[in-house]
Amino acid sequence: MRPPRRIDAFVEDVERAIDVAVDGQPRPVLAFSGGLASLLLAMVGRKRSDLRCLVAGVEGSADIAAAKRAKDSFEYRVEVVPLDAARVRTIAAGLTTDFPGLTGAQRSALVPLRAVLLRAPDTSVLAGLRGVRHSVEVGRAAERAGVRLPLLHVLGGGVSRETVRSAAMYLGLPAAWARVRHRSPSEGAGIAQFLRHRDGERLLRR
């Protein structure tokens, strides 16, 4: 049974957006979290290229655990980019310098992405940030930093979680995976404990 026409069209739009983002790179990278958006990009992207899934986080974090399960279940090529307190604070300090107009909370969403960019500096890095969950400012900052965000260029960036879920299930994602709850990037990577903001802006050292 075919999916609703809008889901079929959405998947085709995602395929085109990924092709543009990959830009002919033979081994692009996906900043992977195990969330719905990154699962959808992984499902589409690996059919079109030799996709590597890099997950940045603290050992034992939700994102790393989900990525390892995805590797076992779907045979994704998963690599871990380990983070610790010192690494997180170094990256956060750099983001403060590069993006002074963002709030501390907004910059915290970019820490795992910056970690993946630093691990894979010479190839296209994709991520699943969406306009619905993340502010326009965060998306623009991520793209200025070098991350490619295919879902921001589909449906004007206003892609709902339900649309992503329906598309992923249409492509074969099991229902149990489709029920994964949303995690913020800092929560999923397990780095929120290292990021403390005074008045919502300044990074404090523990």
Residue ranges and their predicted role:
Residues 1-27, 47-49, 170:
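RNA-binding accessory domains that recognize and position tRNA/RNA substrates
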Residues 6, 24-74:
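ATP-dependent adenylation/pyrophosphate-handling site
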Residues 10-14, 104-112, 159-163:
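Soluble or luminal CAZymes and related metallo-dependent hydrolases
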Residues 14-18, 36, 40-45, 70, ...:
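Structural preference for long, well-ordered alpha-helical segments in enzyme cores
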Residues 24-25, 119-122:
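Glycine-rich phosphate-binding loop signature in dinucleotide/nucleotide-binding domains
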Residues 52, 122-126:
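Beta-sheet entry/capping signal
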Residues 59-117, 129-155:
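ATP-dependent adenylate-handling ligase core
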Residues 125-206:
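Mid-to-C-terminal catalytic subdomains of enzymes
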